[in-house]
Amino acid sequence: MVAVGVAGVALLWPLLAALVPGCASDLVTPVQEQVKPESSLLRPKVMIAIVARNAAHSLPYYLGCIDRLDYPKERIAIWAATDHNVDNTTAMLREWLKSAQHVYHYVEWRPMEEPRSYTDEWGPKHWPPSRFNHLMKLRQAALKAARERWADYILFVDSDNLLTNPRVLKLMMAENLTLVAPMLESRSLYSNFWCGITPQGYYKRTPDYQPIREWKRLGCFPVPMVHSTFLLDLRRESSRDLAFYPPHPDYSWAFDDIMVFAFSARQAGVQMYVCNREHYGFLPVPLKAQQSVEDESENFIHTITEALIDHDIEPSGHLYLSPSLQDTMGFDEIFLINLKRRLDRRTRMLKTMTSLGLQPTLTNAVDGKALNTSQLQALGIEMMPGYKDPYSGRVLTRGEIGCFLSHHSIWTQVIERSLQKILILEDDVRFEPRFKRRLQAIMDDISRTQLNWDLMYLPPPTPKKIETPSTSNIYRMK
């Protein structure tokens, strides 16, 4: 037996490596491949709860906003219920669910065809105890379904709320709060939160509300009440104790769904928050109990016109909507003045006019920025010596001259075509609530009183004569 020392082993190893090809490579550990990064996490699972009653007027735009949420549809479940309808809500919601269900993770549908009203209600806008009771049961059923399906969040959105910010879901989740509402805006100070609450659970005025509602203070604020639209994080342990129905055993406030839920949150130790860091959407001002579905529809039209000012909203593409009826309200023409380069305003105004049921005649405005001195001279336009704007004290700008020429071209058409009565709208007009009804009432009053008029500024309600030294037939509607 031959003994080989350590030195011999050291010499033998290179010799073996040279004599046996591949020996060294088989024994040496290969270099590790580059490690691939981990993939991103899937978005949390969300259930959106839709409870609709007599909402055929609002569903197309409401569902259009749901469609355009910037969130993976396969991570969203839809829970939808409707009941006690006198309009087309059930058929419309069913049509949307059938068409859209393939893009969502899961859809649950709870229609109730009959009865069409509650036995103890005065009308469709009245809230008797039976209606509150039924609504709370529906919302509790939605909450139960979300928990059973292991949803991470549930989003409650009233069927007349317009979520115009597509990122609202992501933004609210990023706040990392158990119960949070995006602040919604309306034509008044009304919104979907309270800053104060009385010992009896009713709304209480506080100095904190208006600065938040008017975006003078920005952030997320603890409040005693949120309603209409809010996001609940079901991953939080405290969320297990939240309930819409039945009311908490210690509950003694009025029988009202939002008050019952606010009390439940208080007892569960869940703080409600409202956020106004961005503009998230709109909601209509509530109507009175004696008002009708038609009043509600008219009220919602104004919500649409306000939303269209800064947002490009559309009805849901999953619904077939017959063309809306448009008319000129008895005017020979409704002229809409628009600068050709302001396509954004033209698009907004045409959508607004469609929602109002008005048929406009588009008129290209004279662009004051394109006017020069030689063009004005060629048109025979001269500034009156010493004239200054009565409000600003300055001479007229080219833009104001262009505005005048735009109107002048319409007046010329009136004479040439022998038009008797026209309405002129500029593309930055903002409509008042119930615009058509109020304008029709004004025109009826004028006809009844046989008012001799040439020009009126619109709106609003009661006529007040403008004192001018040269013209007696000009009125401003105030």
Stretches with model-predicted labels:
Residues W13-Q34:
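N-terminal signal peptide
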Residues S40-L41, G64-R75, N85, E95-A100, ...:
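Short, acidic, metal-binding catalytic loop of nucleotide-sugar glycosyltransferases
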Residues V46-A55, Y62, L69, A81-T82, ...:
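A conserved hydrophobic helix/loop-capping motif in glycosyltransferases and polysaccharide synthases
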Residues I66, D83-N85, S159, K340, ...:
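Conserved short acidic donor-positioning loop in nucleotide-sugar-dependent glycosyltransferases
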Residues N88-D152, L358-L419:
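Active-site-proximal specificity loops/subdomain of glycosyltransferases
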Residues S130, L143-K144, N161-P249, E432-K478:
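Conserved catalytic core of nucleotide-sugar-dependent glycosyltransferases
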Residues K144, W150-L162, Q420-R430:
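Short beta-strand-to-loop acidic/aromatic patch adjacent to the donor-nucleotide binding site
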Residues E185, T229, P249-W253, M259, ...:
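An acidic/histidine-cluster motif and surrounding catalytic segment
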